Amino acid sequence: MATQKELDKTYMDMAIAMSRLSKGIRAKVGAVAVTKNGVVVVGVNGLPKPLGNELEDKTYTIISKFGENAKLVCDGLKSKNTVIHAETNLLVKCAREGVSMIDSTVYTTLSCCEHCASMLASVGVKRVVYLDEYRCTKGIDVLKQCNIEVEKFNG
């Protein structure tokens, strides 16, 4: 029988593989949920199908302005408000298929935002294992406040 460390590595490898399917430029995030009954559900960050595959909008800065004319430079990308995070996508799949997330473990390539952390807590997730830490760690705080085990993967 596999050890917990071996299982963690296997499921994190799956989350990493799923992240490669994301069409995001700024962030490619994959998530895998393993229920207490061994059901595996996956998700990636993306848009609802009718909205296409462009997850980001370009951001611009005015570098000079002469009268009515302005010279702009593209200075980055910002995720669209309609992007569905990987954790939310897998929860949507669970809801559609009638899969319970009570006492499940979620493996994600990027630690949760506050919103996703709240959703995971609401459906009864027991444990979250993440690969990289998101720049804002409030999601980790929410998980801990909800008595969910949180681990940084060190496989």
Please identify what each model-predicted range represents.
Residues M1-G155:
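Zinc-dependent deaminase catalytic domain
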